[in-house]
Amino acid sequence: MKEKRNGEVVGSYKRRLYMDIIQALTQELQVEKWQVEAAVKLIDEGNTIPFISRYRKEATGSLNDEVLRNLHERLLYLRNLEDKKKQVLSSIEEQGKLTEELKKSILEAQTLVVVEDLYRPYRPKRRTRATIAKEKGLEPLANLILLQMTDKSIEEEAESYVSEEKEVKNVKEAIAGASDILAESVADEADYRIRIRNLTVKSGSVVSSAKKENEKSVYEMYYDFEEPISKLAGHRVLALNRGEKEKILTVKINAPEEEILSWLKRQVIRTDNPNTTPILEAVVEDSYKRLIAPAIEREIRNDLTEKAEDGSIKVFGKNLEQLLMQPPIVGKVVLGWDPAFRTGCKLAVVDETGKVLDTTVVYPTAPTTEAKIKAAKETVKKMIEKYHIDLISVGNGTACRESEQVIVDMLKEVPTKVQYVITNEAGASVYSASKLATEEFPNFDVGQRSAASIARRLQDPLAELVKIDPKAIGVGQYQHDMNQKKLGEALNGVVEDCVNKVGVDLNTASASLLEYISGISKAIAKNIVAYREENGRFTDRRELLKVAKLGPKAFEQCAGFMRIQGGKNPLDATSVHPESYEAVEKLFAKQGFTKEQYFGDGPTAIYIKDYKKLAEELGIGEITLHDIIKELGRPGRDPREDMPKPILRSDVLDMKDLKEGMILKGTVRNVIDFGAFVDIGVHQDGLVHISQISDKYIKHPLEVVSVGDVVDVKVISVDLNKKRIGLSMRGIR
């Protein structure tokens, strides 16, 4: 009977916990409770975010992958919070100090910081001045002072605590020890810390100064800097952190100390007793300055950093998504050009399928001679003629602009139309030195591999960029300064979402691409490639079940994202999930034709009057039916086709050719908190400051522009000495 009652109590606690988390997520994400419950259930059942987002829309009310990832992240945090509460309650209860009021406060805490505040007085402590004073038997004296009711002077009261045995040499030491106990007690009071933290955030500021006067650095704007904590922008937080880390800046929090001390004294000193008030005033000041303020400063700075990192990771993720979703340039022979100075520019010719046809090195950049420049041009011209090169993909790293000038001059001497593109080469060197690149190009050196990668990035950016750690792609700000685990998880999520949005060709996709598909691990991705090599091409999606370690659950998660061109079933070339094939067959039958006719020379349109009724007849959800019809309208459509295509160039401008007021077309290369860098075809990217991005007020550049966008910009300033170009998108129609 007792066991049954205990089981009921545990069950009741778990249900309450579950409902608390559901309620919190509903409020935070501003969605319906049933949507959150469905999403949590699907996640707990082992379904991936891309699968839930694409194939379980009825269950979640069409929550997209971004909302689902936020939900998953917050779900993990809230569950971690509940685990922490459980651990804290258990620890305090074991000490016999758990009151109903304290229990209620802990259970109602909304953050880990508040739980830690409440637990602080009960947490096992290292040896402090207060614990040493307690060991010397001075706690009763501390309690006496705190009561503020003694008629005697504290010096008189303290005499009885002087003890050679306990190493309390005199009255002064006794009072000092008692004061240490009280200072720690005040610092441990959760309500005090919460109020002081809130006051500091509300009225405090972040202040920075230079460690050395008149030192030139990129942090000069922070040499005499102060901004309210509540208004400090994320990119400034990260810049201050970096300046401090590089030992150029001193950064601290300026708190409203007078206001805090005045309030804190009112809480601690309840009566004006001349015997105790002076001591308690000193206790409060010591407690705040020695114990509370440094801890609160650390917490606030950690919180500012965490929020700034989260914001930066979000920007990095959006930039990465745009880079990955750039449209492929298909059916073109591409020359990849990895620019460099001393070691020469590495070139690689890649055919329409991505196969490397030839590689070489030319030396047209400094230190060079006219003869070397001429030889480089002749080499490239011969390659263009021999391999019928259509495009040159130039990496945007060191010596890019010098290479660009050579290419432009050379193209004027070529009879056929060849254009070039400046390609983001971030991470190419990381890839070229990787184990994967060594396996792919065992006979190439790192430069040749890098050139091949730069060429392939133009042909299929997604397929090439997945081979690189997303953190190395570098379309963000301060990415090397932040929590690498959190950054890695977020960016891997972005890559996963992009790969699954596009889908992969099951018969050509590399293991690097396959491992990002929903439900597919690195091991299974390698097994798919091994199966393909041993048995030839896949002709049916269900053949995946023959792959080692790929069971029914993994098949359910991955099948809809795998495409088979020219297979047994034309639906295998679409994003229609195999679980819906029967419904599609019924749909075609109702329309009066077969799938073979539809995908062959038969009718090309499907007519539906009542989606709701038809969905019921087919045994699927109405949203799923809409998705199926959309897919059948453009089978196997690549969503990247809707993205802006890269600007192909055959000439280059010089900075000195720019004039204020010129309108130019450019490509957004990077988006950061304070603006966007745009490639306008000169030797330097221009900056569109956030204030120049839109005619209306915007909080962040991403509201208007993304990496890869082709935009019209107006030149508003040119600084040849500092090589800076100011651009504007305002007032351009």
Where are the regions that the model predicts?
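Duplex nucleic acid-engaging cores and interfaces of nucleic-acid transaction enzymes
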Residues: 67-70, 77, 81-91, 95-336, ...
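A glycine-rich phosphate-binding loop feature that marks nucleotide/adenosyl-phosphate handling sites
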Residues: 198-205, 337-341, 397-399, 423-430, ...
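Short, ordered loop/turn segments at secondary-structure junctions
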Residues: 55-57, 146, 256, 339, ...
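Short flexible coil/turn linkers enriched for glycine and charged/polar residues
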Residues: 32-33, 45-46, 112, 138, ...
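Single-stranded RNA-binding regions, centering on S1/OB-family and related RNA-binding modules
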Residues: 12, 567-568, 572-733
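Structured, non-catalytic alpha/beta "coupling" segments that mediate domain-domain communication
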Residues: 91, 105, 116-118, 243-256, ...
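Long, highly charged, low-complexity intrinsically disordered interaction regions
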Residues: 21, 73, 80-97, 107, ...
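Short, Lys/Arg-enriched N-terminal segments with co-localized hydrophobic residues
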Residues: 3-18
